[in-house]
């Protein structure tokens, strides 16, 4: 009986406690254009493309698009979707988002919202996001993601 109980507990711990981690690193060039209004609020479209690699050895190209907003009180928003296509033509789409609290630091959050079959285990993975921009709109970014 004790052996059965230990076997069941071991199975439950492995099944429910198993989480993985993957790290993505990317570089690219961003293009941000839009409007700044008289009250200093703004609405801008964000587009970028570049290259990525993962801690599992995959690599490929990415394209991103979304919005960068600021209201008249200085509250900022960043909501961008990036499609990452691998060397094997598999893909995953990551939503990257930030609010005012993290706007200046380049830190934020991300979540994987869609994926092809080979990346389907990553759907729902939550990630920390960090990006550094150079003066020329080139950037370096990293996401550290946890998944089950």
What kind of feature is each model-predicted range?
Residues 4-13:
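Sec-dependent N-terminal signal peptides
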